[in-house]
Design a protein with these regions (language model features):
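Short, well-ordered beta-strand elements
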Residues: 44-54, 96, 106-109, 128-132, ...
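Alpha-helical secondary-structure segments
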Residues: 124-131, 162-166, 206-207, 234-236, ...
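Gly/Pro-rich hinge or "lid" segments in bacterial periplasmic/extracellular proteins
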Residues: 179-232, 236, 365-366, 370, ...
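Aromatic- and charge-enriched surface segment that lines or borders ligand/interaction sites
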Residues: 96-141, 164, 248-251, 309-311
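Detector for C-terminal structural segments
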Residues: 2, 42-43, 214, 288, ...
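N-terminal lobe/hinge region of extracytoplasmic solute-binding protein
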Residues: 51-102, 133, 203
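Surface-exposed binding/hinge segments that line
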Residues: 43, 110, 144-189
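Ligand-site clamp/hinge motif
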Residues: 196, 225-270, 423-425, 431
């Protein structure tokens, strides 16, 4: 379904004149919700019910890194700059427009007047200033998004509608994206903001806010009547917990819930011909991988965790990678419902996807055995190699007990590693435990996966040495405990490169470096397998519009625009949720300004520029 969300032109311009003109165009094209929010959904409006099969780590946006929680929090908090549903393009979020200085180091964001938090308090630039500075000044609040601010020198609210972010150097990524802004009047007086659960009667800026959460009852969210784009057409979103995906699928069949995501291929195929149910295999923005512990260290370089020391040897890590047949896992476990992988950036982002046939660590057990032989790992009489201390080379493989594909993959991986003389013990744990253990280095191998955002900067940033956590797991977040100063330099180069072609090449080089370090064996890019009750709901907005996903979007769009069957004629454009006048003004305004914008763009020749589990 094509979204009705307003999608103004990109607003990243070096010319303040052009930015101002486009800001005007965007303001005219967007709904008049900032001035007069729509009334809340009617009392009889349904709530959208989704299956919750993954773990919630915390609903604190400064700390949460699990994918399931991120899906919840994206409905509650907006960043300054959002990603649109049409093509993951930059669109207004909490800010209505933005501009940069000529040297690219000063970004000025303008917030509209009259927008409100869900409790009725005004949204101001001071909220954004407090959020950014809280992360910059408190190491305990850096876990989720600290790496996004590596180049930020200062953040200041000049007045209630103007926020200025000053960078130490120009950077390619818009500093207003990704980071959720929280209400200062709720968070500033907390004695321990890092320990705040944020799980009851919360306050947000997005289309829905959390009313309550507990592990047994799930998450209950209600529509935000003050949402600046206009209130949603549903009363809220409820995340109903199920022990596993089989139970969730049965609940979808009986009508207990409306949407299930994270389906296994077998479940997806079984639902394809079910009456009143529609399936969607969206192009995935996630990669599936096996993380390999290279010797975890804390932020100050102190060894931590209980990883097998043999994995500190690059030859062993590379041999492990070569022993794993990703093509077989894609065909047998995923039933082909995905794409072959190279690096960490999926094919859905062609600007940064590492498209190469030169993969020296592809499946090759003979080469893996030769590598281990040459590295001095002798084969024992029982077919298990000996490490450098003369002990059998045995590794632990950890996965999530909530994901059936993890055990299925482990059943393949164990004998494959045996073929190269490595014994493997397999243990499936709760998702939260897998996260905790992997964070502090208590693993050898583990199944992992990350949802990737439209810009690769964050994903690359969590591979820097500075992304390593404290000994207790607090502080920064590291993808796989990788640290290489040469990679850090490459990250900084792509981070600051404003030429798109050059930056794309640097991003691909960075993926190549991670690949050859063999700390992350990327297996495949899985399609997002979802199903919903089409007897109750009109087709959902997908992101991107062509072949995209319903759940796990970079934004709230599918939930915000959810429309019960029979009400599609009332949906109209989002701008129409307040009044037809708003829509007419928006369209007319955009047309009137278009000529001015085109003129300014031609005249100034301003260059435009273009997300763990």
């Amino acid at each position: 379904m094509t979204p009705n969300i307003p999608h103004p032109p990109r607003l990243r311009f070096r010319s303040s004149t052009a930015a101002a003109a486009l800001g005007l165009a965007a303001a005219l094209a967007l709904p008049a919700a900032a001035a007069a929010p729509a009334a809340a959904a009617e009392d009889n409006a349904p709530a959208l019910k989704l299956a919750l099969t993954g773990d919630i780590d915390t609903l604190n946006p400064f700390i949460s890194i699990l994918a399931t929680t991120s899906n919840v929090l994206r409905l509650q908090y907006e960043p300054l700059v959002a990603y649109g549903a049409e093509a993951n393009e930059e669109i207004p979020g909490m800010a209505e427009s933005w501009e940069t200085s000529e040297d690219g180091t000063v970004w000025t964001f303008t917030l509209p007047e009259g927008t409100k938090w869900s409790d009725g308090e005004p949204i101001t630039a001071e909220d954004a200033e407090w959020t950014y500075n809280a992360i910059l000044d408190n190491d305990d609040l850096k876990q989720a998004n600290g790496s996004l601010l590596s180049s930020v020198e200062s953040v200041e609210a000049e007045d209630e509608t103007t926020l200025v972010i000053t960078l130490s150097e120009a950077q390619a990524v818009n500093p207003g994206t990704e980071l959720p802004i929280v209400p200062e009047h709720v968070w500033a007086d907390l004695e321990d903001p890092a320990g705040y659960g944020n799980d009851k009667d919360t306050v947000g800026s997005g289309p829905f806010v959390v009313d309550s959460y507990d592990k047994a009852a799930g998450v209950t969210m209600s529509a935000n009547p003050n949402y600046w784009r206009g209130a949603a057409k549903i009363s809220g979103v409820t995340w109903v917990p199920y022990k596993n995906s089989d139970a969730a699928v049965q609940a979808l069949r009986t009508g207990e819930i409306d949407i299930v995501s994270g389906l296994t291929p077998a479940q997806f195929q079984a639902l394809e011909n079910e009456p009143n149910i529609t399936t969607n295999a969206g192009t995935g923005r996630r990669y599936q991988a096996i993380g390999i512990n290279p010797g975890a260290q804390t932020a100050d370089g102190t060894p931590m965790g209980d990883g097998n020391p043999a994995l500190q040897d690059l030859a062993v890590r590379q041999a492990v990678a070569m022993a794993i047949d990703s093509d077989t896992l894609l065909a047998k476990v995923l039933q082909g419902l995905g794409d072959k992988a190279t690096g960490e950036i999926p094919m859905t982002y062609p600007l940064y996807h590492w498209d190469t046939d030169e993969l020296p660590l592809a499946y090759n057990p003979d080469a893996a055995n030769k590598l281990l032989d040459e590295a001095g790992y002798e084969m024992g009489a029982d077919g298990i190699r000996l490490d450098k201390e003369g002990k059998p080379l045995s590794l632990r493989l950890m996965g999530r007990n909530s994901d059936p594909t993890h055990q299925q993959m482990a059943d393949y991986v164990k004998p494959w590693l045996r073929e190269i003389g490595i014994d493997t013990s397999v243990e499936m744990k709760a998702a939260a435990q897998v996260n905790d253990d992997s964070t502090v280095g208590n693993y050898d191998l583990y199944f992992t996966g990350w949802g990737i955002g439209p810009d690769p900067d964050y994903q690359l940033s969590i591979n820097q040495c500075s992304s390593r956590p404290n000994a207790d797991g607090t502080g920064a977040t590291s993808e796989n405990n990788y640290c290489d100063p040469a990679f850090d330099e490459l990250f900084k180069a792509q981070h600051a490169e404003l030429d798109q072609e050059k930056r794309s090449e640097l991003v691909m080089q960075a993926q190549d470096m991670i690949y050859n370090a063999a700390v992350n064996k990327v297996l495949y890019y899985a399609n997002s397998l979802e199903a919903y009750r089409s007897d109750r709901w009109e087709p959902f907005v997908t992101q991107p519009a062509e072949g995209g996903v319903i759940t796990s979007q970079n934004g709230p769009w599918s939930y915000y625009e959810a429309t019960p069957v029979g009400e599609l004629s009332d949906a109209g454009a989002v701008a129409d949720s307040n009044s037809n006048t708003g829509l007419v003004i928006g369209v007319a305004g955009a047309v009137l300004v278009a000529g001015l914008v085109a003129f300014l763009l031609i005249r100034r020749r301003s260059a435009t520029a273009d997300d763990r589990e």
